[in-house]
Amino acid sequence: MLLLVEDQSFFNHPGVDVKEIVRVLRDYWLYDKPIRGASTLTQQLIKNTLLTREQTLSRKFNEVLMALLLESAFDKDFILNRYMNTVYLAQQGNKAIYGFEKGAKFYFNQPIGTLSAEEMATLVALVKGPDYYHPIKQAQRLAKRRQLVLTIYHKFEKIVK
């Protein structure tokens, strides 16, 4: 579910998705803003664990370079596992909740392997911004994002069957 929403070509790119970058550049040219992001899961992992949040060209260049280096040093399963264990999903007082396993316990009080599709979609929805999609403060916003995740997931399910 995560890859369907965040990086459908994860297993087919070298850490950077050139087609998505070209699409974002086109969007900038046509609309003066991107319609959606182009960062791969590998780039998100680099950004979340090694770089600052500043939005500069030099930071983006470093992110791309480091993603390419990471992909040349580690296999996709390692990178995906690392992402799933380090992605920020919640804040509980002064304690941050990182990773899907801890997120499942925090939000649903159960191991990740026992989550329903809707519960898993909630965690995937939160990846985009745990504060922006806060389950209590922004319940409607989260519900809309969760529904989008489920729609993408169910479309893929139909294609596979």
Task: Give names to the regions the model predicted.
Residues 46-161:
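Non-catalytic, structured segments within soluble enzyme domains
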Residues 1-42, 82, 93-103:
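Flexible, acidic/glycine-enriched loop-and-adjacent beta/alpha segments
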